[in-house]
Amino acid sequence: MNREMLYLNRSDIEQAGGNHSQVYVDALTEALTAHAHNDFVQPLKPYLRQDPENGHIADRIIAMPSHIGGEHAISGIKWIGSKHDNPSKRNMERASGVIILNDPETNYPIAVMEASLISSMRTAAVSVIAAKHLAKKGFKDLTIIGCGLIGDKQLQSMLEQFDHIERVFVYDQFSEACARFVDRWQQQRPEINFIATENAKEAVSNGEVVITCTVTDQPYIEYDWLQKGAFISNISIMDVHKEVFIKADKVVVDDWSQCNREKKTINQLVLEGKFSKEALHAELGQLVTGDIPGREDDDEIILLNPMGMAIEDISSAYFIYQQAQQQNIGTTLNLY
């Protein structure tokens, strides 16, 4: 008896539609709804670090298993590695990985897929979905901090989903990377004004929507940098000072248990008695289902602190897997 599974490399995923934001928005809307309805299984993700005490926060391999129920039930795991100096030292993308999908009926593997494109695009979809609920309607000014793959896909997805963006403020600690990023995007979208800023404060203070896409292990964004009505999607987790959590009008997370883990900023604040689950406005899925309202005032400063959830990766991968099957894309592998 033979069993087959589908292998999809990055080119296959792109060919199946995985380089555009809508499939991820659709997949995450379903995954976040399942999260809000508690129709999922998602163990806390373990971090494999070669130097747990002294290593860089972005140097790790993470295992992210999950099962999602509902109409498109699927199980799987993302295994994703990261080295913060891959781009600067090795001219490689910071992160790389694979996703394995399993048929929930048999638990047999049905697909192996390149993970870093899916991971970066689903992360961008988190910001897109959050912005639909938490950003000011018709916002025009977007800020991107960090010009790597994550920043690129965040910008791509925001521009695909919001046609009212007029200015994009960009900052990266490497000025040459920032200049290349701005020049490339200015050529692609000449109707939008892309502005390379001198420092992070200038970029943040100009953004109605601010998205962090760095590998920093130290906070640098101060509350007073944020303009009234700003929404900040703290994708890279470590960028904002604790005072932003305390002073923001609303704090939203993707999953409380993931965000309240040991050594995470929220956990530190909880242990210090400065934050609690009761102080949390909502989990993102509760906004998607309408159980809790998003933005209620144009002057609110709102912080999203998403740790990233396996259900987002597995749901996205399954949507792309289905599209690849329909289009006969990929390589069939024999399990035995």
From Swiss-Prot:
The UniProt entry's GO biological process terms, in alphabetical order, are:
siderophore biosynthetic process
Which domain of life, per UniProt? Bacteria
SUPFAM superfamilies on file = NAD(P)-binding Rossmann-fold domains (SSF51735)
Quote the catalytic activity from the record: N-[(2S)-2-amino-2-carboxyethyl]-L-glutamate + NAD(+) + H2O = (S)-2,3-diaminopropanoate + 2-oxoglutarate + NADH + H(+)
Write out the pathway annotation from the protein's UniProt entry. Answer: Siderophore biosynthesis
Please tell me whether the keyword Signal is annotated for this protein: no
| Positions of NAD(+) binding | 122, 242
Keyword annotations: NAD, Oxidoreductase
Please state the Enzyme Commission number of this protein.
1.5.1.51
Cellular component (GO) terms are:
cytoplasm
Q: Which GO terms describe its molecular function?
A: oxidoreductase activity, acting on the CH-NH2 group of donors, NAD or NADP as acceptor
Give the phenotype of cells or organisms lacking this gene.
Answer: Mutation results in abrogation of synthesis of staphyloferrin B.
Question: Record keywords: Oxidoreductase included?
Answer: yes
> What induces the gene encoding this protein?
Up-regulated under iron-deficient growth conditions. Repressed by Fur under iron-rich growth conditions.
Give the residues annotated as active site. Answer: 78 (proton donor/acceptor)
Family stated for the protein in its record: Belongs to the ornithine cyclodeaminase/mu-crystallin family.
The record ties this protein, via NCBIfam families, to: dehyd_SbnB_fam
Give the quaternary structure. Answer: Homodimer.
Name this protein carries in UniProt: N-((2S)-2-amino-2-carboxyethyl)-L-glutamate dehydrogenase
